[in-house]
Amino acid sequence: MSKLSAILRRALALAARVVLLAALGICGWAFSVAAQDAYPARPIRLIVPFPPGGPTDVMGRLICQGLSDQLGQQVYVDNRPGAGSTLAAKIAANAEPDGYTLLLGSAATLAIGPALYRDAEYDPKSFVPVAMVAEVPYVMVASPKAPISSFSELIAYAKAHPGKLNFGVPNGAPPHMLAAWFKSLTNIDVVLITYRGGANVLSDLLGGQIDLAVETSSILLPQLSDGKLRPLGTPSSKRLADLPDVPTMAELGVPNFIASSWTGIVAPAGTPKAIVDKVNRAVNAALALPATQAKLQPLEAQAMFGTPQDYADFLAGELPKWIAMAKLSGAAAD
């Protein structure tokens, strides 16, 4: 065999291997696309970091119902409360990135938890944003037994009597962060009293054992409607439809004090974009339904629409803010 023939044979063999590898690559890509087109082929779990019955759980179940209808496959809630919502996030972060495990995230889960819990073992980069869901406004309130009845009176009294007013907060939760942030922005001396849970804060607020609190409008509206609490202001970007006489913090002279209780769906990092996009479209479609809108109303929740990139941009602004609040608060994990 001539030297030229040997070289030609080796070249042909190499070319054959290249063609084979390319074909295998195309087949693998085609298989991946087909698998994503077939998604979902089995039930999907949505991990909710709070116990059954609470506002976040209700929100999760509402979304699961809408997603089940849109995707044609069961989507169910898996309640995993504990460790300041970091337990649920840790489970989700370590799940297979195949679209069959989703997490209903919030500021508490994605920002505050990793900032307060050293053993959280995850951070925001452990997830890929999928879809925004809804936001609920906060309201700052005073006990009827407190020596103030308006925001201006709060500021004046706190400056005239440093350390005499107190603020009840659920330890390590978003209202704790907001109270600490409010103190910093207004430069007033009020004492933060920590509680194990928001229900205990509300009980003592109604009983007059504490003076001030900040909570979501969904929790406070019944007491506000009955006149059992005094509304002082809302850190919302606009006045609330159900509380039109309550001014925003910007109107009251604290323009940077803007925050809401938001929720959104995230998936383990590495989840294929095609699956992320498919779930995103399903969430948006479910949120747009009149039946969903009607069920959001009693929760004081406003649907949030957008692409995965919109949610990523939203988180890029929100997460650093809440992480900074967590550090400012000096809160310690229970």
How should these model regions be labeled?
Residues A35-S126, G163-L165, N171, P175, ...:
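N-terminal (or domain-start) structured segment
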Residues M1-A13:
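N-terminal secretory signal peptides that target proteins for export/translocation
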Residues S106-A107, P144, S217-S218, S236-S237, ...:
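Short secondary-structure boundary segments
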Residues A38-P43, E251, K273-D334:
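An extracytoplasmic/periplasmic, membrane-proximal ligand-sensing/linker region
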Residues A15-W29:
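Bacterial N-terminal signal peptides
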Residues D123-M132, G168, D189-I193, D211-L212, ...:
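Short beta-strand->loop
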Residues W29-A35:
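Sec/Tat signal peptide C-region and signal peptidase I cleavage site
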Residues N94-Y100, A115-N200, M249, W262-K295:
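Hinge/capping helix and adjacent helix->loop/strand transition within the periplasmic-binding protein
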